[in-house]
């Protein structure tokens, strides 16, 4: 499929009045601060693996530092998956909440259920308490994802959007690694107690150091505050310095009521809408309000209007694309096995203990995610995704074939599955786990972006919940080697799907990406020189 090409030069060429370095530093600093939230996300995602590994083994019970709690296989399957089924509820709630209270305060409110979840886990006395803690942690995970991704898409320049949108995935992996590492030297209750500090720090960081999204402020008819927020995000520049970018942002968001649209056609403005506006200006006596009526319409839409907009190509085409991506993502990352990784590693037969393999593979995932941050702007999302998906598929197929060979052909070499596992976790962190979340911040238009991103995150984790809850049953049906082969085969099919349907969005404006998904290829080729 032909790739997108940006319809304009880098944003800095049009805004040479203020310092580019300060602008970059302000955006990077803001995104790093808000991503303290995602550190708690990663710890929440990892804690079921730690607890299940401590409280359940093949004979049913493992004593963890004198802890008398136990988990049956059924309780473990529910505990490992209830986190993921509560995530969609939080995701749907965040889609509505961030439109009401704003991106900033939606991110700040994440800390409340997360703090409750860690406290309940610390004081847990039975399986029900574990479920309650996962409900709270799952809600906090769902509440955090959509506003963080939406905020990046609305505040970061195209030249930085790719690397900074992958920072959240890196922070998630960092949180998981820290949780795994702590679990090797202390009981899981102590891990939960220490983790209670994370939501407190993240709440303070977001409230004190993060400005509200300019796009959301525009949608609430607060242009003066929006301009100040944009100026802060561009290196504490003056509002006069960001006037040009503010006008472009206002037009794209559909809230500008005064500027001449024709000068922005080459920047990605829909030419059909421009023509209609000019038609109304010529054929009505009210030449000033015609533009206002058309462009201000988006800011007056309600919740039901936003839901109706899902029937439009601007929303439903990227929605169906990204949901299929997430379906294959669930298999390629091997995330349904995450709560049971200690048992999986033990069955494969590796040269080191399962607990330290967990730490080691989390380091590889973390390194892969960091490499993504450093290379995505140069290499692009599409080639990174295709190569990583293919290598994850071959790694899982290789592990499955190896395990079959040890059963039927008496062949064994523990370093072969170790190398394949290393490849699986490294490339899942490099080009599979972060990419769809990066796309969520880019592919949706302003109208409905908050709800669409929340719904996407919710359904993605609902799929993951179903696969996680059924993992042990599927393992009984297919055996673990067969399950690796099934996962690898589905990932290979997903690679072919993405090869056919995934556009390149790196260094492209949001207008360019929107044109791609509405299928306006004629205008697209004229504006972007598609090859």
Regions found by a protein language model. Give the residues of each.
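Extended, hydrophobic alpha-helical segments
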Residues: 234, 245-259
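Boundary/linker segments of alpha-helical solenoid repeat arrays
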Residues: 238-244
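Transmembrane-helix signature of 12-pass secondary carriers
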Residues: 2-225, 258-531
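TPR/TPR-like (Sel1-like) alpha-helical repeat modules
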Residues: 223, 231-238
């Amino acid at each position: 499929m032909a790739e997108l090409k940006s319809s304009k030069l880098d944003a800095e060429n049009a805004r040479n009045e203020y310092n580019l370095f300060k602008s970059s530093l302000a955006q990077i600093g803001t995104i790093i601060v808000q991503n303290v939230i995602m550190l708690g996300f990663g710890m929440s995602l990892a804690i079921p693996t730690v607890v299940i590994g401590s409280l359940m083994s093949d004979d049913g019970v493992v004593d963890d530092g004198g802890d008398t709690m136990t988990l049956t296989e059924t309780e473990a399957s529910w505990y490992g998956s209830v986190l993921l089924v509560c995530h969609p509820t939080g995701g749907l709630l965040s889609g509505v909440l961030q439109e009401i209270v704003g991106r900033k305060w939606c991110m700040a409110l994440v800390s409340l259920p997360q703090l409750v979840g860690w406290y309940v886990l610390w004081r847990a006395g039975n399986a029900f308490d574990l479920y309650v803690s996962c409900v709270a942690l799952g809600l906090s995970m769902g509440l955090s994802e959509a506003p963080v991704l939406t905020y990046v898409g609305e505040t970061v320049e195209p030249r930085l959007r790719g690397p900074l949108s992958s920072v959240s995935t890196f922070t998630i992996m960092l949180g998981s690694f820290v949780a795994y590492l702590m679990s090797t030297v202390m009981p899981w209750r102590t891990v939960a107690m220490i983790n209670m500090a994370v939501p407190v720090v993240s709440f303070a960081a977001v409230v004190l150091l993060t400005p509200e999204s300019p796009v959301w402020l525009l949608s609430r008819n607060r242009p003066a505050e929006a301009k100040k927020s944009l100026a802060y995000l561009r290196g504490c520049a003056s509002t006069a310095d960001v006037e040009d970018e503010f006008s472009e942002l206002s037009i794209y968001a559909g809230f500008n009521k005064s500027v001449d649209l024709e000068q922005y056609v080459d920047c990605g403005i829909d030419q059909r809408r421009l023509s209609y506006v000019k038609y109304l200006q010529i054929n009505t006596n009210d030449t000033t309000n015609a533009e206002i009526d058309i462009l201000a319409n988006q800011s007056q839409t309600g919740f039901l209007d936003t839901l109706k907009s899902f029937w439009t190509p601007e929303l439903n085409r990227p929605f169906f694309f990204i949901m299929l991506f997430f379906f294959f993502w669930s298999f390629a990352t091997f995330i349904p096995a995450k709560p049971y990784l200690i048992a999986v590693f033990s069955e494969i037969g590796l040269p080191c203990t399962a607990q330290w393999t967990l730490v080691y593979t989390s380091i590889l995932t973390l390194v892969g995610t960091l490499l993504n941050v450093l290379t995505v702007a140069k290499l692009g999302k599409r080639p990174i995704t295709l190569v990583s998906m293919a290598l994850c598929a071959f790694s899982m197929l290789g592990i499955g074939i190896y395990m079959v060979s040890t059963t039927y052909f008496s062949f064994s070499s523990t370093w072969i599955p170790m190398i394949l596992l290393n490849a699986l976790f490294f490339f899942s962190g490099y080009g599979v786990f972060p990419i769809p979340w990066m796309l969520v911040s880019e592919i949706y238009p302003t109208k409905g972006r908050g709800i669409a991103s929340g719904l996407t995150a919710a359904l993605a984790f609902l799929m993951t919940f179903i696969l996680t809850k059924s993992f042990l049953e599927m393992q009984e049906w297919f055996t673990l080697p067969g399950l690796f082969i099934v996962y690898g085969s589905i990932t290979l099919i997903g690679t072919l799907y993405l090869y056919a349907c995934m556009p390149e969005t790196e260094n492209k404006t949001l207008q360019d990406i929107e044109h791609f998904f509405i299928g306006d290829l004629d205008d697209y080729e004229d504006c972007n020189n598609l090859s």
